[in-house]
Each structure stands twice: as C-alpha cells, then as structure tokens.
C-alpha cells in the first residue's frame, strides 16, 4: 500500500512451482534477530518511521470495517488514531453521511518523507473493489503540528474505475510523487506536488501488469480465492534509489523493472510515451514491499530489500550487480506471514509489517473479518 553489508540466514527449501528462490549466504553468517514491536487486532499493511523515530501504521478496509485507518504506534505498542479521530471516522455503513474527501476511506500506505511530513495514500476502494467517488487521495500531514497540511484529490482520469493506488515514493527534490496502481489495469502515477496535477504513465504497459503464467504460492501451495480465482495484482512494489532509478514490479510477477525518475518527471508527466525508457532488471520473485536504504539512515543505496511472502522472508538484492544480481535471504521466520511493507528508523533499524493476507477472509471462508497482525523489527548488519 522502503542498508551496509547484509547477513543472510536460512536456505530456502520446498518452494512451490514457479517461485524464484533466494540464495543463501555464507553458512558462517547469522540472521539478525527479529523482534516484535506491536501486535494489532486488525489487518495492517503499511508502516513508516519519521526522522525522529515516530512510527505510523495503517489498516485498510479489506475484510472488515476497520475502526482505525491510520495510527501512531506508541512506545508501549498501543496505537493512537492519527492525525485525529475525525480523519479516522469513516465507516462503510455510514459512508453516505460522511465526506470521503476529508476522511480516510481505505488507506493502503503511509510514508514519512524525512522532511517533517507523513503522507497517507488512500485508494478509497474498500475490499479492493469499487472506488468511493471523491475518495482517492494523497494526504500530507505536518508532523510538527499533527495536522493535515494538504490533500491531493485524484479524479477518474487518475484513479480510474478498477484502480487501487498502492504505494508512493518522492523525488529527492520533493517536487514529484510516484505511485503504483495495483488494480485491474496497472500503471504508475506521477504527481507534481506544486500544481497538484497527476498523470497515469505506463498505463497498461507490460511492466505494470500481472505477469502471465505466474502463480502466487504460500504454505507450499497455490493461493487462490474460494471461488478459484488466482491472485492477480498489478504494479505494487516501488522504491526510489539515491541515483534516481525508480524500481517497481507487479505483485503477481517475478520481473523487476526500472526507469530514471527524470524521464517520468519530464516526458511521462507531459503525456509522452516512456515505454522506451523502461529497463527490465532481472527478477526478485513474488514480492510486496520494497525498501532501498540511504546513507542518511545508515543504508546502502545499492541494496534493494524485498518482502518475500511465499517464503516468510525478507530478502535483498545488490543492485550494483546489474540485472543478473542474485536475491539473498536476510531473515526467514515462520512468524513473517506475508511480510508486507518496510520502514526504517533513524538508527538504521528496519521495520516490517506482517499482513497475513493468506489467512484473511479473502482466501479462507472460515476466517474472521478481524485479522490479528504484527509489526516487527530487525537491525541489519553493519
């Protein structure tokens, strides 16, 4: 709906058909310790950490009418609606009585920009189905005042019917935002923050669509809906490297793609075709969240961290090795049931949510609407 040398742990075994395995590192290496930060009574997806260490999470309205959409995680692990209860007051049952323009409808992602703001991406599509008219938006909250500072609303030329705006990254100069649309027709969305104008790019391009022939597996078997439909999510994972390369891929797919952000800002935003600027960049298997560290957070801008839900793992790829670079396991743990989204603290600690998607009522008929989920952390090796 985001490090220096990396230590790998367990070799991957017993992978389902069609899955891309991460390579084990040296047997002498030890996995970083995985620690639980908080547990939730509802399905979490996004997490982000501000430059001062404040932690924020979000809860989409997928299988239940979540009582809180965006929250700050307090030091004792409890949560507090953020920025206030008012913005979190939307309920599906009373949606015709509350304005979707200034309430969180179905939040998929939260991202702190490192410059005093946290951004909330709201595709406004409960259960990933029909859009709530007037609901799709990107919201900037000022961390100093804890007040909403700006709302960027998206009309149907951007949030088209069937869309699901998934995750967002920001250009280094703070002038543009780049979003993935994992809905029925995948795309990237480029938003110029000064003007508020947004443009769909690579709309329907192969790099943003589900990859034919790819199936998502969990617990050693194919994951599908009770009616037999396969898991099909378009452009989802996204990360922006310090050198200006924007990386993304469909969730239902193995292939990684990249483009220079400058091409999106100039040609793409102007409506020009940027398909020729897209570069295939190897594979990373089925993934959900991406994170590229930077020097400010004791990271390495060449390392792409990847959540690997098929194997209950966090993996990494050294982008400096080019398209043939291998995916390696950082930490693999049975508790990482559908590792979803990354955040990184100012001390370099990496946070990751587990959204338990395979355990949800989407895929299990007898699953309760409310799904217990968790937030974890680990410290990558120096």
Stretches with model-predicted labels:
Residues 55-64, 103, 120-124, 129, ...:
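Conserved beta-strand positions in repeat-built beta-propeller and related beta-rich domains
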Residues 343-382:
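Blade-level signature of beta-propeller repeat domains, shared across WD40, Kelch, NHL, RCC1
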Residues 40-52, 96-117, 121, 158-177, ...:
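Beta-rich, blade/repeat-based domains predominating
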Residues 70-76, 134-144, 191-192, 367-381:
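Beta-propeller blade signature
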Residues 35-68:
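Beta-strand-rich domains and repeat architectures in extracellular enzymes and scaffolds
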Residues 193-197, 259-270, 318-322, 380-382:
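Short loop/turn segments immediately following beta-strands, especially the blade-tip
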Residues 57-91, 129-130, 143-144:
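Beta-propeller domains
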Residues 35, 79-102, 147-160, 199-228, ...:
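Surface-exposed loop and turn segments in beta-propeller and other repeat-based domains
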């Amino acid at each position: 709906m985001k490090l220096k040398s990396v230590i790998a742990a367990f070799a991957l075994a017993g992978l389902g058909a069609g899955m891309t395995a991460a390579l084990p590192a040296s047997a002498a290496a030890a996995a970083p310790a995985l620690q639980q930060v908080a547990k939730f009574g509802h399905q979490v997806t996004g997490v982000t950490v501000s430059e001062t260490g404040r932690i924020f999470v979000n809860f989409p309205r997928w299988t239940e009418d979540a009582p809180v959409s965006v929250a700050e995680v307090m030091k004792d692990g409890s949560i507090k609606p953020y920025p206030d209860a008012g913005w979190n007051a939307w309920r599906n049952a009373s949606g015709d009585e509350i304005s979707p323009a200034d309430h969180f409808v179905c939040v998929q992602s939260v991202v702190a920009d490192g410059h005093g703001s946290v951004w909330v991406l709201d595709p406004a599509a409960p259960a990933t189905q029909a859009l709530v008219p007037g609901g799709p938006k990107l919201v900037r909250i000022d961390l100093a005042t804890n007040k909403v500072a700006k709302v960027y609303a998206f009309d149907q030329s951007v949030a088209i019917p069937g869309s699901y705006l998934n995750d967002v990254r920001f250009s280094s100069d703070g002038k543009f935002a780049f979003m993935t649309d994992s809905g029925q027709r995948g795309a990237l969305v480029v938003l110029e923050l000064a003007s508020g104008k947004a443009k769909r790019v690579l709309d329907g391009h192969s790099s943003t669509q589900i990859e034919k022939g790819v199936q998502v597996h969990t617990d050693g078997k194919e994951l599908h809906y009770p009616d037999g439909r396969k898991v099909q999510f378009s452009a989802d994972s996204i990360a922006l490297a310090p050198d200006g390369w924007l990386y993304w891929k469909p969730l239902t797919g193995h292939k990684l793609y990249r483009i220079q952000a400058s091409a999106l800002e100039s040609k793409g935003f102007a409506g020009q075709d940027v398909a020729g600027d897209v570069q295939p960049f190897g594979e990373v298997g089925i993934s959900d969240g991406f994170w590229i560290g930077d020097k400010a957070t004791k990271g390495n801008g060449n390392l792409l961290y990847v959540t690997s839900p098929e194997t209950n793992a966090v993996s990494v790829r050294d982008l400096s090795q080019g398209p043939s670079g291998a995916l390696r396991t950082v930490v693999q743990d049975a508790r990482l049931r559908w590792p979803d989204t990354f955040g990184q603290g100012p001390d370099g600690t990496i946070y990751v949510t587990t959204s338990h998607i395979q355990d949800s009522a989407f895929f299990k008929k007898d699953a309760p609407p409310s799904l217990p989920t968790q937030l974890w952390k680990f410290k990558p090796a120096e």
